[in-house]
Curated annotation (Swiss-Prot):
GO terms for molecular function: ATP binding; CMP kinase activity; dCMP kinase activity. This is Cytidylate kinase. The keyword Endoplasmic reticulum does not apply. It comes from Oceanobacillus iheyensis (strain DSM 14371 / CIP 107618 / JCM 11309 / KCTC 3954 / HTE831). Keywords: ATP-binding, Cytoplasm, Kinase, Nucleotide-binding, Transferase. It is an enzyme of class 2 (transferase).
Length: 230
């Protein structure tokens, strides 16, 4: 890697962002930053402390007093809150159903964006989320926007949950994903929208390997056009 390159991957829930972002980061030797995991970690901590996720001031207090870390490990990225590994807990249904309420608070997003930008300082990163290309890393060299049908996304999340031993109901997942899309797309601060210069990839009928290859091609194309090496 000769020069710093940032890759922003955005899209709705269960569009395949995290899976493909991790693969690309591993292949290129970049740092992977899962911004969604940061919001989930905060949501988990709020629930642990008996705080209503809709109470912005209380959730902000928890955030300002919590150390949320994304640590790289042999078995992938691990998520820690105050030195406690919560990588599995943040994927449970109670967190999934509440994270949108936490993520829509303006003060929470402002603080999270600041933390995420610091993680990308002077590093080559692949960062995924919902507002990376528009707000967190607006100057990212490569911006990707992944989409997929609600049915396909629910199926993927269901299969993922089953593999992890997490209770899962595909009908409920469809509703949760549709509701999440509505909240994410219509919130006042950093809504889920495609950046003007982002490349859209519909992953509905594509394998993860095919999605990965498409994104890698865009990264290599950028490198060739700008004389940057990976």
């Amino acid at each position: 890697m000769e020069q710093r390159i940032t890759v922003a991957i955005d899209g709705p829930a269960a569009a395949g962002k995290s899976t493909v972002a991790k693969m690309i980061a591993n292949q290129l030797g970049f740092i992977y930053v899962d911004t969604g995991a940061m919001y989930r970690a905060l949501t988990y901590q709020a629930l642990q402390e008996g705080i209503d996720p809709k109470n912005e001031d209380s959730v902000l207090t928890i955030l300002m007093n919590s150390n949320i870390e994304l640590r790289q490990a042999e078995n992938g990225q691990r998520v820690f809150v105050n030195n406690k590994d919560v990588s599995e807990e943040i994927r449970y249904p109670d967190v999934t159903s509440k994270v949108s309420f936490v993520a829509e608070h303006p003060s929470i997003r402002k603080e999270m964006v600041s933390r995420q930008q610091k993680l990308a300082n002077n590093r080559s990163v692949v960062m995924d989320g919902r507002d990376i290309g528009t707000h967190v890393l607006p100057d990212a060299e490569v911006k990707i926007f992944l989409i997929a049908s609600v049915e396909e996304r629910a199926k993927r999340r269901h299969e993922e949950n089953i593999k992890k031993g997490i209770p899962s109901d595909i009908k409920l997942l469809k509703k949760e994903i549709s509701d999440r899309d509505e909240i994410d797309s219509n919130r006042e601060v950093s809504p889920l929208i495609k950046a003007e210069d982002a490349i859209e990839v519909d992953t509905t009928s594509l394998s993860i390997a095919e999605v990965k290859d498409q994104i890698l091609n865009e990264i290599f194309k950028y490198n060739t056009q700008n004389n940057k090496g990976v």
